[in-house]
Amino acid sequence: MRAIDTNVLARYYLQDDHAQARIASAVLAGGDLFVPRTVILELEWVLRFVAEQPPEKVFACLAHLLGLPGVTVEDSDKFETALKFCQHGLDFSDALHLAASGACRELLTFDRQFAARSRRRALKPSVRLPTV
């Protein structure tokens, strides 16, 4: 098994460098790859903020990656759950925080929008503002 870095996946999804995109496609087609969770986090950031892709396209790329044969994504179950939460209006990082907190009864945050969106959609665990 070989691990793969963010820039290889970015070339594959963005197709912005023909030579590197061709190589990236061949690497992914060869399978037996491992994608660390940190690569997924960086890929989402690169696609959204560097390449200025709309969230829907970013989420589609991540969902595609999670379904590729021969590609093992670290904590793939949490990323799949996070992408489902994104369909409820959460941004990716908040969705991932919530997905990773699945065994907890609640997630505490000072982010009022995150708490409100999660509450309106009855997402679990519950998200609330901390109090004394």
Language-model segments: which ranges?
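Short, well-structured N-terminal submotif of metal-dependent ribonuclease cores
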Residues: 1-35, 50-59, 68, 121-132
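Active-site neighborhoods of divalent-metal-dependent phosphate/nucleic-acid chemistry enzymes
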Residues: 19, 68-113
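Alpha-helix/helix-capping structural signal
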Residues: 7-8, 38, 112-113
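Active-site flanking residues adjacent to catalytic metal/cofactor-binding acidic residues
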Residues: 4, 41, 110
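Short, conserved active-site loops that position catalytic residues or coordinate cofactors/metal ions
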Residues: 37-45
